[in-house]
Amino acid sequence: MPHHYILTLFGLLPVATNISTWWNFGSMLLACLALQVLTGFFLAVHYTANINLAFSSIIHITRDVPYGWMMQNLHAIGASMFFICIYIHIARGLYYGSYLNKETWMSGITLLITLMATAFFGYVLPWGQMSFWAATVITNLLTAVPYLGTTLTTWLWGGFAINDPTLTRFFALHFILPFAIISMSSLHIILLHEEGSSNPLGTNPDIDKIPFHPYHSYKDLLFLTLMILFMLIIVSFFPDIFNDPDNFSKANPLVTPQHIKPEWYFLFAYGILRSIPNKLGGALALVMSIMILFIIPFTHTAHFRPMTFRPLSQLMFWTLVSTFITITWAATKPVEPPYIIISQVTATLYFIFFISMPLLGWIENKMTNTP
């Protein structure tokens, strides 16, 4: 074994020749994670987890700290980039049947849940108006849990309402969870390379593999450069594009915003929650919108691994993508017609995709005459 065995390990890692640019998003997610930890640390150094000082400390960071505005914007926009990359990464996994590598898929979905929790805690920290009310609405869903709901909510809040203890514990969780994400990411990568990446054809790539470096590393580097360029353009010219106007006002428990909504990357789940007029039903649908991803490896019935040769599944997949976009858009609108019916239809279509996949697999097996 050579001295620089870790570098050699990555350099000589055998990878399928035909993996496309859709396989680049894993390394981009790793870069996003590194950026978030780095910028997050410098922000935490200047942040004060106190309900009277949190909002002022964010203003202090953006105005007085050298390059604080850049750190703050990179951290906020980096979170959006993180979710763009992870949603594309999951979509690629769904399309090309990567979920059949069960351990990797399960660890990946667990990572997604941890990431969503981290992002939610982070959204509360600026203690702006939308931060406060989004936290109130989402954490209040715990009261829908039978018997234990009220106790759980009081325990999470650290009192009978969202207050100073809530902000302190959310900051502590937002700081510690990224380290759990780093550990789980390492596990995810180890589990992936035990079997190796899938490929667009879904065939066994053992007969045709090339070293990861330089062939795929340069391809990854290109997309990484484009992502960083895209981020820097947003930071420099449109830094508030993902921000909610209400969040520029300090949290006021006495004034409710006209339309409470979380960050854009939670809107699909929030749209599903809002589409059900029952509190417990909505909370269950919200949880199931993510948890349903766990069952996918066990409902695969097609003999072909990817959707490359499965036209009906392709149709359903692109319906899911358009449903995801539509429900995200509908969740930004007030709860009134026609947005209520749009949310309900798209929420139903979202779950139909996962329910219909095994049935479509059997139909496609008949179409292709595979036993």
From Swiss-Prot:
Subcellular location: Mitochondrion inner membrane
Gene Ontology CC terms: mitochondrial inner membrane; respiratory chain complex III
Coiled-coil region: none
PROSITE patterns (UniProt xref): CYTB_CTER, CYTB_NTER
Positions with a binding annotation for a ubiquinone: H193
Quaternary structure and partners: The cytochrome bc1 complex contains 3 respiratory subunits (MT-CYB, CYC1 and UQCRFS1), 2 core proteins (UQCRC1 and UQCRC2) and probably 6 low-molecular weight proteins.
Entry keyword set: Electron transport, Heme, Iron, Membrane, Metal-binding, Mitochondrion, Mitochondrion inner membrane, Respiratory chain, Transmembrane, Transmembrane helix, Transport, Ubiquinone
Family matches, as InterPro entries: Cyt_b/b6_C, Cyt_b/b6_C_sf, Cyt_b/b6_N, Cytb/b6-like_sf, Cytochrome_b, Cytochrome_b_C_euk/bac, Cytochrome_b_N_euk/bac, Di-haem_cyt_TM
GO MF, one example: metal ion binding
Protein name per the record: Cytochrome b
